[in-house]
Amino acid sequence: MAIHLYKTSTPSTRNGAVDSQVKSNPRNNLIYGQHHCGKGRNARGIITVRHRGGGHKRLYRKIDFRRNAKDIYGRIVTIEYDPNRNAYICLIHYGDGEKRYILHPRGAIIGDTIVSGTEVPIKMGNALPLTDMPLGTAIHNIEITLGKGGQLARAAGAVAKLIAKEGKSATLKLPSGEVRLISKNCSATVGQVGNVGVNQKSLGRAGSKCWLGKRPVVRGVVMNPVDHPHGGGEGRAPIGRKKPVTPWGYPALGRRTRKRKKYSETLILRRRSK
């Protein structure tokens, strides 16, 4: 990713950075509109997720997470920006004339060929079942349910590692540090998701954040007591508690929020590290 730094000609361009190489020119038959209503509200209009709202209108790109065009070679034609995710996407022209979007693998360039199937080479961008991959393979876009499509390791720079295969299951180490079991018949894509340096890009001003649909975040210590448990006091007062809490009074640090009786509890060998 080529980072272009703005010239400091105005305060709004100071410290700003954008990617100068990736543009957005989607195909009409692979996009459709979205009805964004609420922006963090429920059906009653009450805020259920804070710090969301506004933002520029978006068109959703249909991404092929299933990679079910088996044994048909495709060629990367474009690498495009997708406003619905922080990873880039690339347009694939398959040999049978079909065109699809997939997540852009790191290092893939225009003109590269990819393929999905059971007996395909272990090459960046190829999709195949876990049972056909050697141990230590770096993968992304991993299926949890066979045939449902990739659900794990899809963010920019995400990569998981195949560390073991035993019986009907394969053991994966996910980007979060979690180690879990997945069926060996599930498929994944070889390589790492592109746009690794997305966290190095500086938006430069508050308005750029608003375009993404993210509203300002206010600290609880500067609120009134009616709005937050940390609020109140004269001047720059401390929070008045031994440990910080959420706006609803729950512990803010270290509290586990995962359901204890979730179906995948027995499949997780080691919980994610912070």
Swiss-Prot record:
Location(s), subcellular: Plastid, Chloroplast
Sequence segments annotated as region (Disordered): 1-22, 225-274
Pfam families, sorted: Ribosomal_L2 (PF00181), Ribosomal_L2_C (PF03947)
Keywords carried by this UniProt record: Chloroplast, Plastid, Ribonucleoprotein, Ribosomal protein
GO biological process: mitochondrial translation
Source species, domain of life: Eukaryota
Keyword check for Protease: no
One GO CC term on file: mitochondrial large ribosomal subunit
Example of a GO MF term: structural constituent of ribosome
Subunit structure: Part of the 50S ribosomal subunit.
Homology family: Belongs to the universal ribosomal protein uL2 family.
Protein name per its UniProtKB record: Large ribosomal subunit protein uL2cz/uL2cy
Origin organism lineage: Eukaryota, Viridiplantae, Streptophyta, Embryophyta, Tracheophyta
